[in-house]
UniProtKB/Swiss-Prot annotation:
Keyword annotations: Ribonucleoprotein, Ribosomal protein, RNA-binding, rRNA-binding
Gene3D superfamilies according to UniProt: 3.30.70.1730, 6.10.250.290
PROSITE patterns, A to Z: RIBOSOMAL_L10
Protein name: Large ribosomal subunit protein uL10
Family assignment from sequence similarity: Belongs to the universal ribosomal protein uL10 family.
GO cellular component: large ribosomal subunit
Organism: Ralstonia nicotianae (strain ATCC BAA-1114 / GMI1000)
GO molecular function terms noted in the UniProt entry: large ribosomal subunit rRNA binding; structural constituent of ribosome
Amino acid sequence: MALNLEDKKAVVAEVTAQVAKASTIVVAEYRGITVGDLTKLRAQARQQGVYLRVLKNTLARRAVEGTPFAELAEQMTGPLIYGISEDAVAPAKVLNDFAKGNDKLVLRAGSYEGKVLDAAGVKALASIPSREELLSKLLFVMQAPVSGFARALAALAEKKQSEEGAAA
């Protein structure tokens, strides 16, 4: 379906707004994917807070102009789906996990912190634990000494009570 000029401007404005608050963009080729599979991918992306969109490459290039992602424009050729997110790892993880189960989705490139990543770089980014996973690990590490100390105090109190009970 051809877009008129106003529709194109609206799409570019919407994508530009997403890019402005993004920390990562991942680009994948979707040639040959069924509508059902694409719908599943969109649902997974939505759950992870990833903006996922199939765009005309010229519109995507206009949306990234003047942003830290401008260098990614060189990689925008062919039928591509764009994953954009504030979370640095989420778009790479969503698209990489889906590509493992569907060989028709091919990771092409990405951009993170102003650097263009190749497919291997996107896969490496996808292997990093998410922010929530890292925070839960940090919380566990911080709680371990406190809970150990609390268990030691409880054991000491129990020992004192048993000694007092035996002495009486």
